[in-house]
Amino acid sequence: MASPAIGQRPYPLLLDPEPPRYLQSLGGTEPPPPARPRRCIPTALIPAAGASEDRGGRRSGRRDPEPTPRDCRHARPVRPGLQPRLRLRPGSHRPRDVRSIFEQPQDPRVLAERGEGHRFVELALRGGPGWCDLCGREVLRQALRCANCKFTCHSECRSLIQLDCRQKGGPALDRRSPESTLTPTLNQNVCKAVEETQHPPTIQEIKQKIDSYNSREKHCLGMKLSEDGTYTGFIKVHLKLRRPVTVPAGIRPQSIYDAIKEVNPAATTDKRTSFYLPLDAIKQLHISSTTTVSEVIQGLLKKFMVVDNPQKFALFKRIHKDGQVLFQKLSIADYPLYLRLLAGPDTDVLSFVLKENETGEVEWDAFSIPELQNFLTILEKEEQDKIHQLQKKYNKFRQKLEEALRESQGKPG
């Protein structure tokens, strides 16, 4: 029996996508086994009729086979019920296959909340308008606030709250993040305003301060001075937000393309959800010497995809002195990196804290003229409602007094 031709198998395949092809036998009349279905035999490797079949010739033919052309390969038939997939090269990156047997709205691992545990009391906003944690709109003069978790909202938004109180059993406690356990805690009962007189330094003084700062920095987060006199560096901001924040619901995280093209994923949906951030979470930002406090707040909200108004928040600088903690609210035009440069890299000397803007100071210059006119319209409406309620209250009181007087006139006194 003649040996099979080069590139053939001595046994038939069971799943051949096409009828087997036979080549001319080298020495006998018996047809060789069927050819390999996914491989094409080059013409140069097929020996002519009457060629020598010695062992050396076969070895030389097997030793240096030519590469198989891609067009001669036959694709495997796709099994019914499966989608065709591309075959990746060996060693190439394979995307992670993450699947879930649950749909997002029906995921049993996500506990359903119904707005339970809140203990709302009336709050008078004397310093200026506040912000509703549910709808995000301004709250003027009168609001409702939970005594436990500080959730603030309009009176008409009370029935629409679905977020449970995180401190149902009592007053709000600090739910700290893992980063906060690495730093010692001091007495934070003292909050005073610290006023400092600062003079703009020269470029030579800035260079000396940057060299001194980098020599004391131990985490490779130094500052770099540019030729135009500006410099860049890192700051850490502690997030101490007791009230919930609002984020868009049902969208994917921000990709590199969105960050480069400045695409806001929150603008693609109108669905909103609220949750509580861990107290004292730490976020690191890379900013320049021209970055203001307002830009730092907007950058933090963008990183967490928070859609609340930036005026709802304020940036404070925290100074540790004599075992006490002194807070000072920074103006929206201050430069945090310059303050970091003056204080040095030690966070025990100076640190930045993001909190709710509830100091009673309102930046009226940040509002547009239509917004200010809207404030006046809402205030006038609330004033008329209060006047109507007072008139109705005292009218009922007068009617009861008159009825009591009429009843007392017929009785001997």
Curated annotation (Swiss-Prot):
It comes from the Eukaryota. PROSITE patterns: RA (PS50200), SARAH (PS50951), ZF_DAG_PE_1 (PS00479), ZF_DAG_PE_2 (PS50081). The modification Phosphoserine is found at S177, S274. Residues 265-359 form the Ras-associating domain. Keywords: Apoptosis, Cytoplasm, Cytoskeleton, Metal-binding, Microtubule, Phosphoprotein, Tumor suppressor, Zinc, Zinc-finger. The keyword Zinc applies. SMART domains: C1, RA. Transmembrane segments: none annotated. A zinc finger (Phorbol-ester/DAG-type) spans 117-165. One of its GO terms (cellular component) is microtubule. Residues 52-74 have a biased composition (Basic and acidic residues). Changing C220D: Strongly reduced interaction with HRAS. Residues 1-103 are annotated as: Disordered. InterPro entries: C1-like_sf (IPR046349), PE/DAG-bd (IPR002219), RA_dom (IPR000159), RASSF1-6 (IPR033614), RASSF5_RA (IPR033623), SARAH_dom (IPR011524), Ubiquitin-like_domsf (IPR029071). GO terms for biological process: apoptotic process; lymphocyte proliferation; negative regulation of lymphocyte proliferation; positive regulation of protein ubiquitination; regulation of protein localization to nucleus; signal transduction. The modification Phosphothreonine is found at T347. Changing K302D: Reduced specificity for HRAS and diminished discrimination between HRAS and RAP1A. One of its GO terms (molecular function) is zinc ion binding. Its main location: cytoplasm. Residues 361-408 form the SARAH domain. It is found in: Cytoplasm; Cytoplasm, Cytoskeleton. Pfam families: C1_1, Nore1-SARAH, RA. Potential tumor suppressor. Seems to be involved in lymphocyte adhesion by linking RAP1A activation upon T-cell receptor or chemokine stimulation to integrin activation. Isoform 2 stimulates lymphocyte polarization and the patch-like distribution of ITGAL/LFA-1, resulting in an enhanced adhesion to ICAM1. Together with RAP1A may participate in regulation of microtubule growth. The association of isoform 2 with activated RAP1A is required for directional movement of endothelial cells during wound healing. May be involved in regulation of Ras apoptotic function. Interacts directly with activated HRAS; a RASSF5-STK4/MST1 complex probably associates with activated HRAS. Interacts with KRAS. Probably interacts with Ras-like GTPases RRAS, MRAS, RAP1B, RAP2A and RALA. Interacts with RRAS2. Can self-associate. Interacts with RSSF1 isoform A. The RSSF1 isoform A-RSSF5 heterodimer probably mediates the association of RSSF1 with HRAS. Isoform 2 interacts with activated RAP1A and ITGAL/LFA-1. Binds STK4/MST1, inhibiting STK4/MST1 autoactivation. This is Ras association domain-containing protein 5. It comes from Mus musculus (Mouse).
